[in-house]
Amino acid sequence: MAGPAGGRELSDTPTWAVAVVCAVMILVSVAMEHALHKLGHWFHKWRKKALGEALEKMKAELMLVGFISLLLIVTQDPVSRICISKEAGEKMLPCKPYDGAGGGKGKDNHRRLLWLQGESETHRRFLAAPAGVDVCAKQGKVALMSAGSMHQLHIFIFVLAVFHVLYSVVTMTLSRLKMKQWKKWESETASLEYQFANDPSRCRFTHQTTLVRRHLGLSSTPGVRWVVAFFRQFFTSVTKVDYLTLRQGFINAHLSQGNRFDFHKYIKRSLEDDFKVVVRISLKLWFVAVLILFLDFDGIGTLLWMSVVPLVILLWVGTKLEMVIMEMAQEIHDRESVVKGAPAVEPSNKYFWFNRPDWVLFLMHLTLFQNAFQMAHFVWTVATPGLKKCYHEKMAMSIAKVVLGVAAQILCSYITFPLYALVTQMGSHMKRSIFDEQTAKALTNWRKMAKEKKKARDAAMLMAQMGGGATPSVGSSPVHLLHKAGARSDDPQSVPASPRAEKEGGGVQHPARKVPPCDGWRSASSPALDAHIPGADFGFSTQR
């Protein structure tokens, strides 16, 4: 079967050329696989479990792209033999029809549904050799997708996956760079100056605290507060007083007051957990990609509004996160007139849309994918012969869309994503990233032993009908097992559950927090907790 013009079949190619090309591809593939393996080993060595899982999901995405490529290769010839009418083939084209001679409109239209064959046959590149005879032309019809268009679609999917992974890594890198500024604020919490300034026996009027002064006043006016929140995300999205107040509220709600808890390291762990979600192209995002390709026909400007929507969503999310901080400050002001010690907010899901903090992550994941789609589409159309003339008739407009997408990516990575990592900790529940591997293993062992003891108690019930019931042994408590695992700063016995989290989950309810009089008397901690955490360090240790 004859190949395309200017090309040769494999039987007409020298064996040394085939061997050289094959060897280069194999060496590059093995080198990439070895590099990913080394990276995974480094994550395991330094106990970066979340990043290791993110790497595994990245490998899964590359495998998915490989499966798609394989399907495109296998089904290329059968799909190119599927014929449709010319009327159907000329509807919803991404570019204006033109005639081959003058480049203007005409009846001799060239189909450009994600493909153009270019000026001459020398531009054609196929995954497999095309059929020698156009079956559909004999029937007066056109092919559903030609071999050339399927090849270009295959290239675009690969470029999209690469840019999504690249944008995810950039987002994680810039977010951690921004969060490094918060580390010095976390270090100040261990100083005597901070402990003296936030002495539990010290009282202040609520309206005199820095947090209330920053977020109330003119900012509390309805309508104006949204404008203030919108502009605040660009200049002072997170200040020192915001960080310290949210930190204190998290500790009071989920731990016990006075703990030396490394809140900054906890946020970093939570961010790594979220990175596992961001780096993956979920089924919902693939559906969004298919929807954009479906709507990308001439006349509605899909690519234009697609470059604007991510920026609008990011600004909306950033404004909402700033509003959450302002609403918590307003609640402190309305709840009590005198603050004892450090002012602390009360975490709750009620501050977020539909009581779902995880929806914020989905919106950011969506905008990240849309930005990657836009950049991948730009690179793909510019690098593919014929498509540049189709999609970039006004190159200045195309460059403006790319600049807008890059600005949205920087805004997401350096401002919105770190703000999300901090503010979403103010939900009703802690993230599981607070537990390390040793603690999780101890909990698993306790669960296994609890099942075994339950079976033993069920068997003893038959023997205890005439006598007393069985008495649980000393080792049936998870705290007992975790004590054997070693006194660590992030063990569950050092991390009592939040009263709000237990109330919402149907667990044991605790009385509401009360502010004692400012006479130097301090509320005593639970004796059960003091027995396990006298002066414990709640910092997470990722290196051993």
Curated annotation (Swiss-Prot):
TM ranges:
16-36, 60-80, 155-175, 285-305, 306-326, 360-380, 403-423
Query: What information about domains appears in the record's comments?
Result: The C-terminus contains a calmodulin-binding domain, which binds calmodulin in a calcium-dependent fashion.
Membrane topology, from the record: Multi-pass membrane protein
Q: Where is this region: Disordered?
A: 485-544
Family, according to the entry, reads as follows: Belongs to the MLO family.
Q: Which organism is it from?
A: Hordeum vulgare
Gene Ontology MF term list:
calmodulin binding
Q: Which gene encodes it?
A: MLO-H1
Its protein name is MLO protein homolog 1
Q: Which GO terms describe its cellular component?
A: membrane
Keyword field = Calmodulin-binding, Membrane, Pathogenesis-related protein, Plant defense, Transmembrane, Transmembrane helix
**Domain of life of the source:** Eukaryota
Pfam families according to UniProt: Mlo (PF03094)
Functionally, this protein is described as follows: May be involved in modulation of pathogen defense and leaf cell death. Activity seems to be regulated by Ca(2+)-dependent calmodulin binding and seems not to require heterotrimeric G proteins.
